[in-house]
Amino acid sequence: MTELKLTEKAKSTALENGADLVGVLNVKNLPEHGERIERMLPGARSVLVIASRHSLASLRSGANELAQFDTIQAYNESAMAAHAVARYLEYQGFFSAGVPAFIPLDMDEPGKGMRGEICWRRAGVRAGLGSYGESGALVTKEYGQAVRLCGVVTTAGLSPDSPLEEDVCDHCMRCVEACPVNALTGGGKNNKKLCGDHIFKFGFRYFQKFIQGMMDEPTDEFRKIVQGNGLRQLWQTFMTGNYYYCFKCQSQCPATRLPVK
């Protein structure tokens, strides 16, 4: 099978199994992640970037649980697509593996679970899926910021896509203005501490605080956590695997629109 035919088949497999967009780039075009990719899959030559779209209604809903539910689904769909592509390529004789953008993550030092093996936003831009927005997120032509990403690393030599020549973001700054904690300042800059404390308010740091409260003498603050909303939210995080609590920058992007064909 030719390189082009193999690439087309890999992409169609992704699109048939939950992906809405697929791009390809050579491992050499991700030099920042070269060592990590080699650790994950020695001899990897290509990376496929997979995007699955959100429901726009869910992102903009006043009921946050709809956006959370849809986030779980979007990640599941991208994961299903990635695994389907990896299995297809292995049937063709190429070592291949799906790589998450969300969880599971490497919890060891120095990252401590705060970053994935590959920056899929960066990979998405270089694979021609979109361009950077003022928030630093990937903005696609088709779905704006309303996508979730993951991908595949493979020893197959696939035909790479080219980065877009156009800038998809119109730099309206609505994502920056929508941020409730002023973590976004434009130009792709993101105060990750401010953003993380808000969007992951019931994530690991909250759990760590909860455990510390159990080890220490009970305080009024800890009692409020146990008796109030905090423990219920923490339980839900464990049950669903989702700990996103803010979708403002995604939902306000004017490029995020209904995918009417």
Regions found by a protein language model. Give the residues of each.
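Catalytic cores of enzyme domains
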Residues: 73-261
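Non-catalytic, usually N-terminal nucleic-acid engagement modules in DNA/RNA processing proteins
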Residues: 1-83
